[in-house]
């Protein structure tokens, strides 16, 4: 997208019917390629000209990103997203997480919090998938249908990244250790009140749990709130009586539930954008579409996440 924008800047189209479209969308109009809707073109439409074929990797990248954004719950856990160009990155580390502004007398020194670089590199993971098919199987298929398949690849990448985020909270990121889990034989409302208290001065605004954990949470009588039920039926979003968003992580280890302040707990690090193997894409005539994304997670402030473990029946 950035390369296309440099070649065909949007500023040139102010006051025209094409205002509001980015460079890629304008090129689709130029070559009369429809990628969505009932009247979407077949895949081979991209390859009618060499210039049109050059747009195909960007189409794949956008379709995958749409799938990632559609299902991603990572944003419910991370405080910030950092984009880097390389593979080496160190996050910050606070020597003292005491944030209270103490009263000082005139001329006295103010208390300080020192930030330094983390002791280790943030581990990055490459997640991706290869969509393999013969040219004959795809050439007459509509782009709208291919977008659905590519979106599922994006959804799979987003799900894996969500599990990576939770793994960093549980096991640490190499510089900071994993969170502390309080033990409980059976989950109760009192356990969550203790979590709420242990997080102070941070706020409890997100709870991450696996399928078993979510089911047990929803069985707690205090969580059977009428308004929360209406919100779930109307929007599909789970909200607890404590005001925290429930994040369902299907691959998360059973017997553990994490409570965190999503504004202070995690940093997401992305190395580049969604990558498409465009060389094989053209040379092998769509036999294989390789899509990948590189990302990792780092803990920011250790006190911003706590956990509770329970006995799995």
List PLM regions with ranges.
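Assembly/oligomerization interface modules of large self-assembling protein complexes
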Residues: 42-127
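Extended, solvent-exposed, turn-rich assembly/linker loops in the middle of proteins
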Residues: 171-239
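Sequence/fold signature of self-assembling virion shell proteins
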Residues: 221-313
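Hydrophobic alpha-helical bundles in membrane proteins
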Residues: 114-119, 141-142, 172, 207
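Alpha-helical scaffold segments that mediate packing/assembly in large oligomeric complexes
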Residues: 127-201, 313
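Intrinsically disordered, low-complexity terminal tails
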Residues: 1-53, 313
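Short helix/loop capping segments that flank catalytic or ligand/cofactor-binding pockets
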Residues: 99-102, 141-142, 216-218, 298-300
